């Protein structure tokens, strides 16, 4: 999940004993019962599930004849229990064995039948065992079921005991020891259970072994009968009872074991004396390694073979239902968990049940679930459930016969893509084959892992362990042990998922919609599939699965980073392996003793029992189900056994447990168990995320509180008492911070290092590291790199500086080539798209780019595009690369050249560029040019387009000769954004960009023609992008439509002068019909017009000049009078249909809207008079004065947004497209509509005005009122305006010259008709998702999502709500603008409703904003074209300033860019990467010195207060800039943040006198209260305060002696005191700002 799994403070939750309290020799199976449980009380969050008894004994409590005990008498397996509400998984580790019970009357009946069935039942339950205590569950030895199958006594460790047991004639009953835990330490938990069994056995032998005439096995089982409650304790000796109490004390101490901390602490638990058994190590890997898989992951590969295994994996990945069955519980559950683990980094999103008990009532109903699942069932399951019919969509995998059985109605599984599948099979087969390689003289690999002595290795010198032959070795494999094979298997799977035809480049096709309260990510499957080099059905189906969809969310804040290391060609198990042997030596040890050295059990354990340890495996890898012949899966004998089970009448319902029946012999409170005083602190991750991330790892052992109990000892290697508290504090807060990865050079020394740590006196020495080959070459091999390069990520260099975590030296930039043209200028037209690599290990990219993207690094850097992890993320050693791109009005407009060939010309060209939304890789792979060539081409392309834009703005047009090249270049999304940002005259000034509504912009007729040509070229390029599934991004459509809606030219000013009532500069309020309606403020605005931006002065026109036509153009216009009349007939007919309802004049608001200033913001009054007739009016006819409101709200960030109304003029095809928009062809009336505007209050209060509005218009004010009450447009005579969007719809044919010119331009495929692109709903969705990403980047919402999420979780409820509201507003703004644009381009309104509602649901917008959008959709039938105003984007209102600073107090320090944002101060490196981010809530104090030009910032860093000094020439400006920004941030919050109150009281000890007392921080100063005296230090006498190793140092200026006196107080709250004093200084400085000259604040320093 995205959220980290909840920490569990218990290593073990429960230890239970399951069996039959009164076993019966007559029946094969009985209902299992809970015989004993520890502890007796349920845990609050996890009560003991009653049905655990069925999971321990899935086929019931079996009874068998003793002669069948020639089979192994104890087995182990694993099951899981998943909470259906929380989804939390607990693991059950179970050891099953048979204990004897004596028959009072010998019964021969059924010996042939029942005994035979018992034989089968024995195997069904017991024929598997997990071996390998340290590294894997691979010790299971499955004996064949044939009658003549007898184990090889010479090879079996239990041979002697089995041989002796063969002739005994007693019955035995199945008994289970089970541990339930949140942690998957399968092998070590199993070892604990075997040790418990050994303790009980040894006690029995010691106490009763000297009695003659009693078989030794009966003695041992007598102890078990007492232990399980079958015999009364009073019947036995007190010595026996004493031993049992000691055993229970051992169990209670085991249950109190401390918990290891991932990447920080390991727990070494002594379950037996050191001379008998080495301590068991419990350790969890840090997030940069694979998650712990404590079982043989390769087991399914062995059982099924590689091909069948991949077939099952395909079923799982494509969300089919899969059921596995086997007689071997262990192989069954391990295989299920292995399949789930093998799909990493994907996560299986549906139910997983490794073992579903046969005897549990109604268990078969789970197989009827409609969702996919993976369930493992015993082989007897379907035979026992007679009435159950298997669903016909379930794939059945028989592990015993190695078959995959397809369901009856199964669809054909798509084959895995080539060549990836061939590569995967090769790697998997190599991994399996490596176990049989004779590269090292190891007789028994599993024993080697268990730490046993290996005779052939004992005589060899230690350095020979690392000397390996160089032949017959694959680069993927670093050893022939099962653990390395498992790592190699997982690496092969990760590499498969990261291949070009599977999921490579995945994150480039995701769009983050929101981060709070939980991440929501949209996956653009269409563009993703289009980017695959080879289209395959497998990739198509995989892209539609929930696992891939969730992967996009998980990858924002991943809980594990091993896949990133693998992408970066790290395959060494020492670096990414999950087993403790590879990293335990790096962790701080916590020693915990379960065994009491004073216990009398030592006497029993001192004599080894007459058998080898039950825990020893007999084979070297996994379950040897591979040894089965075909008869092992014959169900004839199994069917007989199941029929016997059915006769036994097992009660499979959840039992009602009587607590008294399984009460412990002793009380847990009587057990001497030391409470680990600091354990909870050491275990639980610190609540402060920064705290837990930024503290250094504890590589060396630190001292912890020593145990006071002789039975439990906790100690560390470091015994220095002075630092113990501080070290513990660091350990407590550094939980989630992983250790830096081990350099490859450490690999060879691991063996010796671990051997040095292991005591020489150990009977069984644990060797943590198997000798493995040094990774001297990467993967893929060097010689194959060229041909395989397309599929793999680049290797980025790593640099280690001192003791700090490794930091990445970032590549200059990874730029994407345009995917639509093969020419070099088009290929290199993505100059500013950069890959942000947050890796400290040098990772290339998440599911990284194809080689065509990474072979050549760009030489350009945009600081706004680059992000590095904050210090916490870097120290966390959790690299997470992501692609950061920004659009218009981005975070910083600083662009620097960082590579070869960077010249001044290139730099200047790049400065003007805004980067784009491009995240997609090209479909066509081609050899990219060199970095220098790409930079040169990119700069040339930008310069060319800049010249074209300037030519257009100068009125000279695009030029026919340039048209083809312009079209080709605009196929790059980056260059589209670049051109549109230059064309948009609305965003040229800072003030204009921050207006709530986007005013219209007047341009000349010549500029209009040139801009229209450019916009049409852009539309054509967007059509090309959409044809390629949106590769490259399409957010530029928002910018295009904003320009099309706001830019216009005015026609025939000379004709307008003839209009009797035309008064361009006359305020509307002066009209007699509107007298008294304009308020004074509005009238003032009208008298002082605020003109909108105009075309550049190069056009030769002043701001008030209007464009005029030449006489030749007038002649052309006169020559098409007949055409005008033809259009007039159509318009008149359409208008008459709607006239009875409401009459709407022609065009929308226009230029005089700006000339009359922002009327809409205040009065909103505007009138279009019927007498204001112009050319257009003569075509349409007379219209009465009409006033109409249009809404407006925020618009979009880096994308430009437009809002226009009006349908196509005189185009029959366009009229027909409105058929479904409203009754009676309502849309057609807008062909003759003119737009006026009133404020809501005026409409409500003025009766004369309200009567003008028809039925439809009475609804519109209510919409505008609720749509954030935004200002509305002003109205005037806009009939003379021609907007650019009309040209996009084919409506601007004003002259024959225009038609001739358009006909000529069609040579270049610039269509004069409406594009069909506007009717593609997928286009609008993709454009919206791209625009959201662009806006989020512009707002800084996606810079380091991990840090953003951590900060959100650390904030109070009010601040969380504010962040959620910011994201809601962003999404609602873009959705609103999307509706506006779709209306503008005449999209079918039903389609608009469906698409917007779907996007609204996908975005998870909050109730307030979703209600506003829904109201717009409800009134959609009454809205057309420009009725819906544009909401201004949030990024346009952001104000960011950047300062160049030097770290330290002079210019010798490193150069950084300090960026002052709304919520934080961002410190960027000289190449633009984010180095630090300081949220304002973490800043405590800030001062500056104008003389030294040094700015001092104090901030809260975890539990410490940290001082940072920066030198800058603009020190004063920077100080006030930060101060103003912090004040604005504080004003937004409207509530006090949760945190420490001002002042406080702290316990201290005076180091001079040793006296203890209280230190009080007050507004007046510091008050010190001791037993015999009291001291008060005034605030203005405090010169300095700091902390040194838990000591608070205070320097006081004493006026009487005119000296500075130092006070030192020892306190565990030194940092809190320093923080409180600093807060006090800040408060006093703010309150008494006018007295700053008289009272100089101190300059405290925190060490």
Swiss-Prot record:
CC annotations in GO: axon; cytoplasm; cytosol; membrane; plasma membrane
Documented effect of changing residue 372 to L: In DEEAH; uncertain significance
Task of the protein: Guanyl-nucleotide exchange factor that regulates small GTPases of the Rab family. Converts GDP-bound inactive form of RAB27A and RAB27B to the GTP-bound active forms. Converts GDP-bound inactive form of RAB3A, RAB3C and RAB3D to the GTP-bound active forms, GTPases involved in synaptic vesicle exocytosis and vesicle secretion. Plays a role in synaptic vesicle formation and in vesicle trafficking at the neuromuscular junction. Involved in up-regulating a post-docking step of synaptic exocytosis in central synapses.
Residue list for modification Phosphothreonine: 1061, 1066, 1237
Domain (cDENN) ranges: 289-429
Protein name in UniProt: MAP kinase-activating death domain protein
Spans annotated as Disordered: 108-168, 604-636, 678-842, 913-941, 1051-1110, 1146-1243
Covalent S-S links between cysteines: none
Ranges for domain Death: 1340-1415
Ranges annotated as biased composition (Acidic residues): 615-630
Residue span(s) of domain uDENN: 14-268
Record's compositionally biased regions (Basic residues): 158-167
Subunit structure: Interacts (via death domain) with TNFRSF1A (via death domain). Interacts with PIDD1. Interacts with YWHAZ. Interacts (via death domain) with KIF1B; links the motor KIF1B to Rab3-carrying vesicles in anterograde synaptic vesicle transport. Interacts with KIF1A. Interacts (via uDENN domain) with RAB3A, RAB3B, RAB3C and RAB3D; the GTP-bound form of the Rab proteins is preferred for interaction.
Basic and acidic residues compositional bias, start-end: 108-122, 750-768
Record-annotated dDENN domain positions: 431-565
Lineage, highest ranks first: Eukaryota, Metazoa, Chordata, Craniata, Vertebrata
GO molecular function: death receptor binding; guanyl-nucleotide exchange factor activity; protein kinase activator activity
